[in-house]
Amino acid sequence: MLPECRTECVPFPIPKFNMDKSDIDGFMDKLKTFHEQFRDCFSRSEPWENLFRYLSGQFSGLERKSIEPMALHVEGGDVRCMQRFISDAVWNDDKILKRHHENISEDMGDKDGVLIFDESGFVKKGDDSAGVSRQYCGSIGKVENCQVGVFAAYASRHGYTLIDDQLFIPQKWFEDSHKERREKCRFPEDLSFKTKPQIAAEMFQKIRADQILPFKYVAADSVYTNSEDFLDAVENIPGVVYFLAIPSD
């Protein structure tokens, strides 16, 4: 059930993700199998079980996929337990990410794979969300009150998927004027400001150090072209070719 790529076409078309009735009918069984492989990433069974409920809610037909409607919709769901899962549960994030990368390598890994770095914005109405600010929102093409995330994706002739993400926190959030908001959002004490290219560079260095995903190419837009941090990370690596967009000005 992987995307089909038409590599003979120019320009390269967006690959299609083909699904039929059998994929839909057996989806929950496949989701359970997927969920099971992350059991050892949790020290307690309760948060691991709530992960499945959260995933089930995200894949449901609910119009609003916030915690309360999802908890009330899925089997065994409890609103307070689901809220604690999101706000307080502890899991081994690094282990989960490596397991995810192992799955990707097995399903679509290729020596000619491509690592792609870019950011995307999510419009927000209020100011309670971590890192929310009036800033450029690429998803709508203008400045808006939003959160912005930096994303890493993997693509090959066998398919494509996201492989990492991190929330970008604007510099003003680290000023004294935002101290209460940082505390409310439970920012770690050691968290410091990083530019989007710095975040992407750290993602790239970790992916390369883990040696799980095979790749030959690195691609990013002009935001990363102008960053010495990102260029230093991707340049002069034997066997790796990078493609970075050049701004018109």
Model-derived features with residue positions:
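Gly/serine-rich nucleotide phosphate-binding loop at the start of the catalytic core
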Residues: 2-3, 8-14, 20-84
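Alpha-helix C-cap/termination motif
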Residues: 61, 73, 107-110, 210, ...
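Phosphate-ester processing/binding pockets and catalytic centers
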Residues: 30-44, 52, 61, 77, ...
